[in-house]
């Protein structure tokens, strides 16, 4: 029967298992960063995650189905309606990413943003994008049906710090040639305030609990180890004294 692991070895083994279970998630990034695009737009999805040395294999999922591409970047050269949906990725040393939604619209204009939910204090960037980048001018951004900003030449709308007042429905309109075009309406939500960021130096509660339990186990095992060692030494010392006494008694006879 094999000997039980010493306390320190047991602690290291369990700690290594805990780290192996805590695999970082991969991350899907859009390039350009817009969550909504028009038909025929060019879009690249990039997967950020850890790879084994010399192996950049990446698994891509579209609406839950595995894609044939295994490259770190997945390119859509001319977007179609069926390219819209949910994308996720995974690398050799990263777990499956959270889903990223890509919306493909049919029309002349689309109002673009990196996402539709923001925290108070975050910047918001909106873009009025035309199909095949047709020249667009006299552009108006509207919030809840009211004009928010006008540009004679098409420009992005920047909101430096989002507040609750920036929540609402948005669309843009402008001229392509002599034709007045409008985008579909989208909803932007501003939440907040954002939860305070916990310093990475502070361990999550489950890791703290794990360390406390392992510390107690280590202390108990260490105490038991030294107690057994002390008893063994005492027993050996008593046995030596008994043997020595018996030997001296024999000589006296």
Swiss-Prot record:
Gene: FCGR3A
Highest taxon in the source lineage: Eukaryota
Subunit structure of this chain's protein: Forms a heterooligomeric complex with ITAM-containing signaling subunits FCER1G. Interacts (via transmembrane domain) with signaling subunits; this interaction is a prerequisite for receptor complex expression on the cell surface and intracellular signal transduction. Binds the Fc region of antigen-complexed IgG.
GO cellular component: external side of plasma membrane
UniProt GO MF annotations: IgG binding; IgG receptor activity
Gene3D superfamilies: Immunoglobulins (2.60.40.10)
Residue positions with a glycan: 56, 63, 165, 180
Transmembrane segments: 208-226
Regions of this protein lying in the Cytoplasmic compartment: 227-253
Official protein name in the record: Low affinity immunoglobulin gamma Fc region receptor III-A
Example GO BP: antibody-dependent cellular cytotoxicity
